[in-house]
């Protein structure tokens, strides 16, 4: 078993179950799960320099550009250089992937593919706790009390961009941006693609992939 630090990435459109898979990987293998969305929210909330720059774009209804997200992630990764980590939501574009290349070699990339109809149904059942980013799904991860966050008791909201037309546009945007990233990692022999909708079905394969790279801290039965 190699003793080098593991550098892993998970790719997938919003609603593909990335967050759930990442949580299981982190729990079973002790990796740091670094979500670009979560880090962005934290920086917006605490008013860091990069958070303030991102806010200027978001207030205009614009996507946060590559260079801002890259700067956010690079500064976080600098502080995590002695840890195994798993990136979620980064790199989303070829420019971001090339920036990541500048600081490390990625060992393992998982790409989750999901049919549009499934994604549309799943996102329409999705409710979010805005301040923490916690996500609930009414079918397979419902809150204990409908419309209320389990931990804080604050109300949950549905996002505008979880509506079908918005989901279709997001999926197209994701695919257009992710295609060259997927091709890059495929050409390096580090990409593993999974199609389907059920985390439980793909989990044994994901567990095996990571087990070949890093010693588990608990068995795969620990869901």
From Swiss-Prot:
One GO cellular component, as annotated: mitochondrial matrix
UniProt region (NMP), positions on chain: 35-64
Reaction(s) catalysed by this chain's protein: a ribonucleoside 5'-phosphate + ATP = a ribonucleoside 5'-diphosphate + ADP; AMP + ATP = 2 ADP; GTP + AMP = GDP + ADP; CMP + ATP = CDP + ADP
Matches recorded under Pfam families: ADK (PF00406), ADK_lid (PF05191)
Classification via CDD domains: ADK
Matching SUPFAM superfamilies: P-loop containing nucleoside triphosphate hydrolases
Protein name (record): Adenylate kinase 4, mitochondrial
The species this protein was found in: Mus musculus (Mouse)
């Amino acid at each position: 078993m190699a003793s080098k630090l593991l550098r892993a990435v998970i790719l997938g459109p919003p609603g593909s179950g990335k967050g759930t898979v990442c949580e299981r990987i982190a729990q079973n293998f002790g990796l740091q799960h670094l979500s670009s969305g979560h880090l962005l929210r934290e920086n917006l909330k605490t008013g860091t320099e990069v958070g303030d720059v991102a806010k200027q774009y978001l207030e205009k209804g614009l996507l946060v550009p590559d260079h801002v997200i890259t700067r956010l992630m690079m500064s976080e990764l600098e502080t995590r250089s002695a840890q195994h980590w798993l990136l979620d939501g980064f790199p989303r574009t070829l420019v971001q992937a090339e920036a990541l290349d500048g600081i490390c070699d990625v060992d393992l990339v998982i790409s989750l593919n999901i049919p549009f109809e499934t994604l549309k149904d799943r996102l329409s059942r999705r409710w979010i706790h805005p301040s923490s980013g916690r996500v609930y799904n009414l079918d397979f991860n419902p809150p204990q009390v409908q419309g209320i966050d389990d931990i804080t008791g604050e109300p949950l909201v549905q996002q505008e961009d979880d509506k079908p037309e918005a989901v279709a546009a997001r999926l197209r945007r994701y695919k257009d941006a992710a295609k060259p990233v997927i091709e890059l990692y495929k050409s390096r022999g580090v990409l593993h693609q999974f199609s389907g909708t059920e985390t439980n079905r793909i989990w044994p394969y994901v567990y095996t992939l990571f087990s070949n790279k890093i010693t588990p801290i608990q068995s795969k039965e620990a869901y």
